[in-house]
């Protein structure tokens, strides 16, 4: 299944707010509409797991195959499969750029990476799925061209605090990965255990 490129509002209307996909909030449904929709059909456990899986896929902007591969990697690692899955997704380069506040969405971050504008530890990295590590530092190749845009994004984003595992220096225009993030620093409302359960027969 390919990466979704359709209307983003349609997705958040169905799944709720997904900050990585769009900075728009999910539309509020009228109570009568909610009662009517829930009374018309009983929500199955499969659908609940499916929707949690879709939240991860659309928020991080990855394909079905990519998400399944991340689940398989998480299953082989020691520790909580769900928590490791979230760590793998959060440490992607495109997500780190987004969480630093350098772009308003993950698709915007992915575009910067694909166009070879991002340096990791001083070297160009053009792979959005590149897995960042503690002490990696992220900078923009053409600072003069993007300085005003990045600064504006940072100013808007820092109204909501940057996660503890990251640091951004406005003076040096440089982001730093301090450590692997903990569960509380995830920027998405998600039940990762339901995602693991969804893939239980495939991973």
From Swiss-Prot:
Domain S4 RNA-binding: 91-154
Pfam families: Ribosomal_S4 (PF00163), S4 (PF01479)
One BP term from GO: translation
Transmembrane annotation, as ranges: none
Chief location category: plastid
GO cellular component terms attached to this protein's record: chloroplast; small ribosomal subunit
Keywords annotated in UniProt: Chloroplast, Plastid, Ribonucleoprotein, Ribosomal protein, RNA-binding, rRNA-binding
Gene Ontology terms, MF aspect: rRNA binding; structural constituent of ribosome
SMART domains: Ribosomal_S4, S4
Subcellular location field: Plastid, Chloroplast
InterPro entries xrefs: Ribosomal_uS4, Ribosomal_uS4_bac-type, Ribosomal_uS4_CS, Ribosomal_uS4_N, S4_RNA-bd, S4_RNA-bd_sf
Presence of the UniProt keyword Cell wall biogenesis/degradation in the record: no
PANTHER family: 30S 40S RIBOSOMAL PROTEIN (PTHR11831), SMALL RIBOSOMAL SUBUNIT PROTEIN US4M (PTHR11831:SF4)
Reported function: One of the primary rRNA binding proteins, it binds directly to 16S rRNA where it nucleates assembly of the body of the 30S subunit.
Assigned protein family: Belongs to the universal ribosomal protein uS4 family.
Subunit relationships: Part of the 30S ribosomal subunit. Contacts protein S5. The interaction surface between S4 and S5 is involved in control of translational fidelity.
Name of the protein this chain belongs to: Small ribosomal subunit protein uS4c
Organism name: Lopidium struthiopteris
Gene: rps4
